[in-house]
Swiss-Prot record:
Belongs to the peptidase A1 family. Pfam families: A1_Propeptide (PF07966), Asp (PF00026). It is found in: Endosome. Glycans are attached at residues 86, 130. GO terms for molecular function: aspartic-type endopeptidase activity. GO terms for cellular component: endosome. Disulfide bonds join 105-110, 268-272, 310-344. PANTHER family: BETA-SITE APP-CLEAVING ENZYME, ISOFORM A-RELATED, CATHEPSIN E. It catalyses: Similar to cathepsin D, but slightly broader specificity. This is Cathepsin E-A. The active site is at 92, 277. InterPro entries: Aspartic_peptidase_A1, Aspartic_peptidase_AS, Aspartic_peptidase_N, Nuclear_transport_factor_2_euk, PEPTIDASE_A1, Peptidase_aspartic_dom_sf. It comes from Xenopus laevis (African clawed frog). Glycosylated. Contains high mannose-type oligosaccharide.
Length: 397
């Protein structure tokens, strides 16, 4: 009987899944670096590569550090309106709002991306409210609309979303994405908007109130991975999921036991907080810790980045994040990014998030690419397990 129940559960988790393909494309940082503009952008944004502080206080709108999106390479497709208007978005567990550029946006970034035209949608309604999101030293602002949103065949009715009419600076001009679809908790949503996934649950569009993320770190593969709504796919990981309780229902925040270098605890020795964030490509932590970590791995600041010689990766240490008693190892090949020409970028970035939200470590795509991640809203927990790398994919999925 127990085997039958396990098989039934597995069938539900696999065959009731809605799979959203993720494509992998060039990040903003890599594009700017190739153009020789990266250092200029840091200067323009007032960002110190050694120490970046998210200075948003309690009485300000929620802040999204601009550097979080500089290295994002994984994107998916959604549509808004009737008939559907298509957009490329970041599926971001570190925020909770959906926004896309508006046809009324006058910023340079909007002009080079797909823009939503409300007058062409028969199901569009105006909310009448404005919204604003902080990104680094600038803000993205616009109005809130209501319309149908489709994600890989899932039709979400009456979804509130932001229509941006102003986007900050020049950074988003080089972005491969049009907008962002937040998958965080409702408590961090701007404008009292109900997040897309919450509406999926409320409208009975998913089998289970959970979603999961698989990311390929193979630089030679155009296949980025997949976002799965309604459960998880056990063929994408090995072993058992380590279920970790969410400690604060805003971000997908969990307890981090410690951070080890070659088996020695050097950071977070008394335990600290971390978030699992698909909208942040790198692994970030308090700047004082990250400066020390960069020195240990031999990374040095150059060209607006932290770089290491790719030829010495085998001599660099292993970094381990201990979560719920289990060590999640990251080899040098896993925590660095190959830029070409024998140069690799460090996958670590300093980011000081002040109380009460911080301090926080952020386990971004560099980490998620090695560990399949399940986000369970029904039980408020995150599941982690080692990925089974691409290829192969089963049944052509």
């Amino acid at each position: 009987m127990r085997q039958i129940l396990v098989l039934l559960l597995f069938a539900t988790l696999v065959y009731g899944l809605i799979r959203v393909p993720l494509k992998r494309q060039k990040s903003i940082r890599k594009t700017l670096k190739e153009k020789g503009k990266l250092s200029h952008i840091w200067t323009q944004q007032g960002i110190d590569m050694v120490q970046y502080t998210d200075s948003c206080s309690n009485d300000q709108a929620p802040s999204e550090p601009l550097i979080n999106y500089m290295d994002v390479e994984y994107f998916g497709e959604i549509s808004v309106g009737t008939p559907p208007q298509n957009f490329t978005v970041i599926f971001d567990t570190g925020s909770s709002n959906l926004w896309v550029p508006s046809v009324y946006c006058i910023s340079q970034a909007c002009a080079q991306h797909d823009r939503f035209q409300p007058q062409l949608s028969s199901t569009y309604e105006s909310n009448g409210n404005n919204f604003s999101l902080q990104y680094g030293t600038g803000s993205l602002s616009g109005v809130i609309g209501i319309d149908a949103v489709t994600v890989e065949g899932i039709l979400v009715q009456n979804q509130q979303f932001g229509e941006s009419v102003s986007e900050p600076g020049s950074t988003f001009v080089d972005a491969e994405f049009d907008g962002i679809l937040g998958l965080g908790y409702p408590s961090i949503a701007v404008g009292d908007c109900t997040p897309v996934f919450d509406n999926m649950i409320a409208q009975n569009l998913v089998e289970l109130p959970m979603f999961s993320v698989y990311m390929s770190r193979n630089p030679n593969s155009a296949v980025g991975g997949e976002l799965v709504f309604g459960g998880f796919d056990a063929s994408r990981f090995s072993g058992q999921l380590n279920w970790v309780p969410v400690t604060n229902q805003g971000y997908w925040q969990i307890q981090l036991d410690n951070v080890q270098i070659n088996g020695e605890v050097l950071f977070c020795s008394g335990g600290c907080q971390a978030i699992v964030d698909t909208g942040t490509s790198l692994i970030t932590g308090p700047s004082s810790d990250i400066v020390q970590l960069q020195n240990i791995i031999g990374a040095s600041a150059a060209n607006g980045d932290y770089e290491v010689d790719c030829s010495v990766l085998n001599e660099m240490p292993t970094v381990t994040f201990t979560i719920n008693g289990i060590g999640y190892q990251m080899t040098p090949q896993q925590y660095t990014l190959q830029d070409g020409g024998g140069v690799c970028s460090s996958g670590f970035q300093g980011l000081d998030i002040p109380p009460p939200a911080g301090p926080l470590w952020i386990l971004g795509d560099v980490f998620i690419g090695q560990y399949y991640s399940v986000f369970d809203r029904g039980n408020n927990r995150v599941g982690l397990a080692p990925v089974v790398p691409y290829p192969p994919l089963k049944n052509g999925v």
